[in-house]
């Protein structure tokens, strides 16, 4: 079969969506690779992920028929194809899944009929090359294929429970141990008897002859805890068809890497690496990985050392290592992005929008890994040369910890050489590091509530959104020295739990409130408020008067001024987050924060330092929102309603069914349980005080607001005026005067270097004349006042040219310290080693040094011992010359 030219990969996407749109389906955009509704899932790995809540009955959509092309990733967690990518015909990290869905609307008859129509009438697949499977008890599906479609029974394969349990089958799908489930029917394409492999269900089914094209899942049961199946009132259809596999069939090629999309990417990789063999496995890896990496960055993931960011880093570094194998030593991977945009930008406009961000992020990671890749490969070669067939876990960990080699990258390299990694040893080394980190992170005073106490308490009712003080607060628990007690007295350090409180407990980056609790004859100074077991507010403080007992009723009031300063900073972090995403890109995600009375600290994902111009724009945008004086709206709503409302949720955070949404005009909408201003104008002024890196892929901004910002600006102005005074001008002249001063300093430095060179030249002439002859070798060992290491090396070079066969030791003394340089030139090089000579001298003056046989340097302390050490050089040389 010669496939018509119209069946390009992009045309297949369009055909699929147009076909189902014409049959009443709503076309739904692809969900991001980062699931927004399932914290248990690392990446979107199938088409049904974005519809999971619909199938579970937790969400309703405005349509009952849908079709989409979903981008998917399988490179981490349970579903991980990374190790196979590049080495097999059909494994990918990133792939596209074509799917059509029915939510209680059509069922088996229409799903089967439409699938067959699209494959055989639109895409013209020969019917005698197709066969299907059904679950062994699904008589309805079997009959539809035989009677409605007309497939001979010989090409309808019944698949039973082949995974060791009832309903555990390749042809029975279930979301979990309980809940929606049902049989599925799969459509296979026969590549022909020239390809090894048997039909599904046969002993040879894993061969490449019969390839699954389309899986139609019929969710018609609700599985109960006891394993019984109860029919669903509204059965659903969930289908999935891999675009790359289908394209291979429609383009009459056997492997996915031969389709038009991959051939274009492989061609670009070939041009960048100079490798002309288009079947080279490394080119395939690079072509596959550029899709996964680019779309992860599009969806807000950046390279880091944890979670999704680390999966991205692993994929990037695997691609870079394959480039290194091909001899590439310069950045190349980021140069693949324009070709990818040409190929997939029409289908995914978000890729076009983010293309510059993607390229910059990849380039930054290329430059970072290039610093250690060569060194790491040398270490691997050394380890491999002394190992038989196993790379020790400790060495794999060293490659990971010191050289940035993800362990699966090390395993990849080992596999290519017929070796494997001792994963147990690697995990032991990792666990030792985790234990060290945990020990370093512990601090005194950490308290955990006993389980029985937690069970007896109700969550604390927080009153602090509306009130700064409250009464009738009943003491429900009391801790002293970390243990529950019934009473405590004046002088005791305690943690007091009340049924209600106006005190905010530290969470979401916002520090806890301080203040006072008081009752008849008792006063507690509250220094901090912490959240215990995620739901109990513990007032941490000291009883300054009286005795406190369980059941006592107290009044409490927070430090209003401290809270007031804190809320300015908290609201400012929301505006800052929005401004960062507007200026730097939507890849920016919050990674941590501190909201205190005196400052705010905001950590976020970004792959490079922020320029001064970018910082200025960010600060200006935040202050513009402050001046606009938006009202701050608070809404309590269901999680899905909040997301539909436009609220931004933080990746990795766990949210309940109902959430609190904070909206500042049209600029910022986030989920937040903290305390905030009522209008953005209350913030007054926002001023960034610093920006820097925290870890790989994470930046940090610190800032101040309100009176703190005014004080900061006033202090900066004072320092500017002081600098102007010292420079003899006014504030507007500081930059010009500093520039002139810097140029003068550079000129004087050049003049000084010139004078030093002349001094060294004169000293060299004198030293050459004073050289001592030791067995035909000229020996010089002298002290030179004021010479630094560079001047000593210059003098050394001149002396070597002047003296020929020689051994030279020069000591430059300045400020109580000595710089040492030793050199060996000509015939004595084999017997006298400069490094050994310098080490001998340095050890006598309390220093150290070393180097090559012909040149070494070091240092030590100035003093009488230096003269003695230098005087002994001729004898040392004589002894070594023999």
From Swiss-Prot:
Catalyzed reaction equations: tRNA(Ala) + L-alanine + ATP = L-alanyl-tRNA(Ala) + AMP + diphosphate
E.C. numbers: 6.1.1.7
One GO process term, biological-process aspect: alanyl-tRNA aminoacylation
One of the record's GO cellular component terms: cytosol
InterPro entries with a match to the protein in the record: aa-tRNA-synth_II/BPL/LPL, Ala-tRNA-lgiase_IIc, Ala-tRNA-ligase_IIc_anticod-bd, Ala-tRNA-synth_IIc_core, Ala-tRNA-synth_IIc_N, Ala-tRNA_ligase, Ala_tRNA_ligase_euk/bac, DHHA1_dom
Alphabetical keyword list: Aminoacyl-tRNA synthetase, ATP-binding, Cytoplasm, Ligase, Metal-binding, Nucleotide-binding, Protein biosynthesis, RNA-binding, tRNA-binding, Zinc
Domain comment quoted from the record: Consists of three domains; the N-terminal catalytic domain, the editing domain and the C-terminal C-Ala domain. The editing domain removes incorrectly charged amino acids, while the C-Ala domain, along with tRNA(Ala), serves as a bridge to cooperatively bring together the editing and aminoacylation centers thus stimulating deacylation of misacylated tRNAs.
Free-text function comment from the UniProt entry: Catalyzes the attachment of alanine to tRNA(Ala) in a two-step reaction: alanine is first activated by ATP to form Ala-AMP and then transferred to the acceptor end of tRNA(Ala). Also edits incorrectly charged Ser-tRNA(Ala) and Gly-tRNA(Ala) via its editing domain.
Protein's recorded name: Alanine--tRNA ligase
Species the sequence originates in: Xanthomonas oryzae pv. oryzae (strain KACC10331 / KXO85)
Lineage of source species: Bacteria, Pseudomonadati, Pseudomonadota, Gammaproteobacteria, Lysobacterales
Gene behind this protein: alaS
């Amino acid at each position: 079969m010669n496939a018509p030219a119209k069946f390009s990969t992009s045309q297949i996407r369009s055909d699929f969506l147009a076909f189902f749109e014409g049959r009443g389906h709503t076309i739904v955009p692809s969900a991001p690779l980062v699931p927004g509704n399932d914290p248990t899932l690392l990446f979107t790995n199938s088409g049904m992920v974005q519809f999971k809540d619909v199938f579970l009955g937790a969400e309703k959509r405005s349509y009952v028929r849908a079709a989409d092309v979903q981008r998917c990733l399988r490179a981490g967690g349970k579903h991980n194809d990374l190790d196979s990518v590049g080495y097999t015909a059909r494994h990918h990290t990133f792939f596209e899944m074509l799917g059509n869905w029915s939510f209680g609307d059509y069922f088996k008859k229409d799903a089967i009929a439409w699938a067959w129509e699209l494959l055989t009438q639109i895409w013209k697949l020969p019917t005698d090359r197709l066969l299907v499977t059904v679950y062994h008890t699904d008589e309805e599906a079997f009959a539809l294929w035989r009677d409605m479609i007309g497939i001979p029974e010989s090409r309808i394969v019944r698949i039973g429970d082949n995974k060791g349990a009832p309903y555990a089958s390749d042809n029975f799908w279930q979301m979990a141990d309980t809940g929606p489930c049902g049989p599925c029917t799969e459509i296979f394409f026969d590549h022909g008897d020239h390809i090894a492999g048997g039909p599904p269900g046969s002993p040879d089914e894993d061969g490449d002859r019969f390839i699954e094209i389309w899986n139609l899942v019929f969710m018609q049961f609700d599985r109960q805890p006891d394993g019984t199946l109860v029919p669903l009132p509204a059965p659903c259809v969930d289908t999935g068809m891999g675009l790359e596999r289908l394209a291979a069939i429609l383009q009459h090629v056997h492997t996915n890497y031969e389709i038009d999309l991959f051939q274009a990417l492989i061609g670009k990789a070939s041009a960048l690496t100079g490798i002309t063999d288009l079947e080279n496995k490394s080119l395939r890896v690079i072509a596959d990985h550029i899709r996964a990496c680019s779309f992860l960055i599009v969806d807000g993931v950046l390279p880091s050392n944890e979670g999704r960011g680390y999966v991205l880093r692993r994929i990037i570094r695997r691609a870079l290592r394959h480039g290194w194998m091909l001899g590439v030593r310069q950045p190349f991977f980021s140069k693949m992005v324009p070709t990818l945009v040409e190929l997939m930008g029409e289908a995914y406009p978000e890729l076009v929008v983010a293309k510059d961000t993607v390229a910059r992020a990849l380039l930054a990671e290329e430059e970072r890994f290039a610093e250690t890749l060569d060194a790491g490969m040398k270490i691997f070669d050394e380890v491999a040369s002394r190992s038989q067939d196993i790379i020790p876990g400790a060495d794999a960990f060293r490659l990971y910890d010191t050289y940035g080699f993800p362990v699966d990258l090390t395993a990849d390299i080992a596999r290519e050489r017929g070796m494997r990694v001792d994963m147990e040893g690697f995990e032991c080394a990792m666990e030792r590091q985790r234990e060290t980190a945990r020990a370093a992170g512990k601090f005194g005073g950490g308290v955990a509530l006993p389980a029985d106490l937690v069970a007896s308490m109700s969550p604390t009712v927080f009153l602090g959104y509306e009130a700064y003080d409250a009464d009738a607060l009943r003491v429900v628990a009391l801790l002293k020295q970390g243990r529950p007690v019934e009473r405590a007295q004046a002088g005791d350090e305690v943690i007091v739990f009340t049924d209600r409180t106006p005190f905010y407990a530290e969470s979401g980056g916002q520090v806890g409130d301080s203040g006072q609790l008081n009752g008849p004859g008792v006063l507690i100074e509250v220094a901090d408020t912490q959240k215990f077991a995620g739901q109990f507010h513990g007032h941490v403080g000291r009883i300054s008067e009286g005795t406190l007992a369980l059941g006592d009723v107290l009044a409490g009031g927070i430090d209003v001024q401290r809270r007031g300063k804190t809320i300015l900073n908290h609201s400012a972090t929301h505006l800052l987050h929005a401004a960062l995403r507007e200026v730097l890109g939507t890849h920016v995600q919050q990674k941590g924060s501190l909201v205190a009375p005196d400052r705010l600290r905001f950590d976020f994902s970004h792959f490079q330092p922020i320029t001064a111009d970018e910082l200025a724009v960010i600060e200006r945008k935040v202050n513009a929102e402050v001046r606009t004086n938006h009202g701050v709206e608070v809404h309590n709503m269901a999680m899905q309603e909040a997301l539909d409302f436009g609220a931004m949720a933080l990746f990795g955070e766990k949210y309940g069914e109902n959430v609190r949404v904070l909206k500042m005009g049209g600029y910022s909408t986030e989920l937040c349980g903290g305390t905030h201003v009522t209008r953005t104008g209350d913030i007054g002024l926002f001023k960034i005080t610093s920006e820097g890196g925290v870890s790989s892929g994470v930046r940090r901004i610190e800032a101040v607001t309100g009176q703190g910002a005014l004080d900061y600006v006033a202090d900066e102005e004072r320092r500017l005026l002081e600098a102007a005074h010292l420079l003899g001008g006014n504030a507007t002249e500081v930059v010009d005067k500093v520039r002139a001063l810097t140029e003068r300093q550079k000129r004087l430095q050049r003049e000084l270097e010139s004078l030093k060179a002349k001094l060294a030249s004169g000293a060299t002439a004198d030293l050459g004349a004073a050289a001592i002859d030791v067995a035909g070798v000229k020996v010089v060992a002298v002290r030179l006042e004021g010479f630094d290491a560079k001047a000593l090396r210059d003098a050394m070079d001149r002396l070597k040219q002047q003296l020929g066969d020689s051994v030279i030791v020069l000591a430059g003394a300045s400020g109580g310290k000595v710089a040492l340089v030793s050199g060996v030139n000509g015939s004595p090089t084999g017997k006298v080693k400069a490094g050994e000579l310098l080490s001998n001298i340095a050890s006598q003056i309390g220093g150290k040094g070393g180097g090559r046989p012909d040149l070494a340097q070091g240092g030590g302390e100035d003093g009488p011992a230096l003269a003695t050490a230098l005087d002994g050089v001729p004898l040392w040389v004589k002894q070594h010359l023999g």
